[in-house]
Amino acid sequence: MTSIPISVQGYKALEEELARLKSERPEIIQAIKEAREEGDLRENAGYDAARERQGMAEARIKYIESRMALYQVIDLDTLSGDKVIFGATVDLEDVDSGEAKTYTILGPDEADPSKGSISFLSPVGQALLGREEGDEVSVEIPRGRVTYEIIGVSFKGSKNLG
């Protein structure tokens, strides 16, 4: 069984989501019961919506619970070094356009590119792992092949997260 790194903050967020989803179960069951009492289930939008909500919640609960056993929780405040690893913040420059980007390398269940974090499993994340300042990486992304120069590698810890 392969472990999946996750930050302390990411793990806590998933624990909170799991608790919230479990606490919503009685409310969802009540909504299904009330919709069922309205009669014909074939044309009962309230019933269909409540069942769909239940299915989505149960699927997410099952997913989170199955992942919890695989996580290796890492305290980002204890990391340091010169190489890109899980938890590193990497400053990049697109060699062709000069565009600057900064990413923190996190796990797949906590990465959010819109907030500046990417998964170590993403194409860019995989290309960066093990590299250091001054290295160039070339990676295939949806808009085509791009080459980045690593301008800096730092470890800002948990204060750098959302």
Swiss-Prot record:
This protein's UniProt keywords: Coiled coil, DNA-binding, Transcription, Transcription regulation
Keyword Transcription: yes
Molecular-function GO terms, alphabetical: DNA binding; RNA polymerase binding
One Pfam family, short name: GreA_GreB
Coiled coil: 9-38
GO biological process: DNA-templated transcription elongation; regulation of DNA-templated transcription elongation
Gene3D superfamilies assigned to the protein according to its UniProt record, in alphabetical order: Transcription elongation factor, GreA/GreB, C-terminal domain, Transcription elongation factor, GreA/GreB, N-terminal domain
Primary role: Necessary for efficient RNA polymerase transcription elongation past template-encoded arresting sites. The arresting sites in DNA have the property of trapping a certain fraction of elongating RNA polymerases that pass through, resulting in locked ternary complexes. Cleavage of the nascent transcript by cleavage factors such as GreA or GreB allows the resumption of elongation from the new 3'terminus. GreA releases sequences of 2 to 3 nucleotides.
The family this protein is said to belong to: Belongs to the GreA/GreB family.
Protein name in UniProt: Transcription elongation factor GreA
Species annotation: Desulfovibrio desulfuricans (strain ATCC 27774 / DSM 6949 / MB)
Gene behind the chain: greA
